[in-house]
Amino acid sequence: MSEKELFNVTIVTTGGVCEKLIPYVARVTRGFDMRAISAPFVSKSQQEKDLELLHKLLRYKHLSVFEFSSIVFQIECPIYVARQLMRYRCSSFIERSLRACGPMESDEAYFAYNDAIKAGQKREDARALLPLSTQTRFLWSLNLRELLHIAEERLTPNAQAMTRDIVQKMVDLTSEHFPHVIEYWQSDRVIGYWKEYRKDSKCPTK
């Protein structure tokens, strides 16, 4: 991460899981005798059926099957942003100790914060000048269902800017490993938190 960047997001691992696992899990719940998940698609028609099922699962919000696919992210960002992300407890975190972070002159930060407020900056952004803006690094393990839930809440115009940018980057990176999941989810996202903004705002991920 360069000195000019305020955050960085990378994928550490997806555990070798691919999109084929999701329709597999869905069919297991119906008692079907399934082919090995590691095998290639049997035919184009079978692949089309899998993708159609994947789309239906998202459209009708049968989301429990997405809990079987997990991703581990490494995120670097200010502490105050990390704390917003760590409110989502259906996931696992491990964070770098503050003892590994350099010191910051609190008096200087305090005066800079007051100057920013007087200049009209929002408090939610001006607090980046306080010691809580110290950079931290953490690993975040979560399943696809939780990731989509977080994106529904944080990819909205009223979300804190850097938190929204981080979640956007997480979605972008996830699309490289689960392209159809993200594509179908974006195309159908006129539900949940997006209803409120559908008329006035464009989806940030479009």
Feature locations, PLM:
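Family-specific signature for flavin-dependent thymidylate synthase
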Residues: M1-K206
